[in-house]
Amino acid sequence: MRIISGSAGGIPIAVPKTLLRPTADRVREAVFSMLGERTEGAAVLDLFAGSGSYGLECLSRGAASCVFVESDRAAGPVIAANLKKAGLTGGTVATAPVESWLKAKTGQFDLIFADPPFLKQKGDRDWDAVLLASEELTGLLAPGGVFVLESFAKSAQPPPPGAPWSCAVERRYGDVVVRLFLFSLPAPDAAAPGPADL
C-alpha cells in the first residue's frame, strides 16, 4: 500500500498486523478521483481507520486536518508512524470504539470516511445500518460535506426510511462497493442527487 498522490505521493503505508482487509490502492484512487478537489483545506474524519490510508491520502492532498478513529490499540502507533514517515501534519489519532467516539464528539467535518468490518455472515455487525441511522454521524457532517462508505457488495444496505442521506455515487470494485452520500432532506418531488452534485 502507498499514498497515491499529493505531497507524500508514493510513500508506503505500513499496515497493522491485525488489519485483515486494507483498502486497495485502486479503490482509493477511484474514490479520490470522484472527490476531485474536495480534499483541499478539508476537515476530515477517518472512521475504522485501520492503517489510516484514507486520512493519509487526504492530508497528502491538502486537507487541513484529519481525525483517525480506530478501536484496535495496535493501529494507533502504526497510523502515527505513517504520519511521521510521510511528513504529514494535522493528524490526530483517537483509539476508541467508533460508536462511543461519535456519541462524545462535537464539531463538523467536510469529509467523513468509514471502512467498517464487512457483514459477511450471520452474527456479523451490520455497520451500514448502524452508520446510516446514526444521528451523531449526520450531526458531524458539515453543510455540503460528503460521507464515503465502503461496504461488502453483497450486503450493502441502503439508508433506512427517513434517514437524511442521498447516495450521489455508487461504484463496485470486485467484492467492494463504495458509496458517496450527501446529507439531504429533499422535498418529496425533488430530483435525486447525482455525480454533478459532488
Could you say what each language-model-derived stretch is?
Residues M1-L198:
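Class I S-adenosyl-L-methionine-dependent methyltransferase catalytic core
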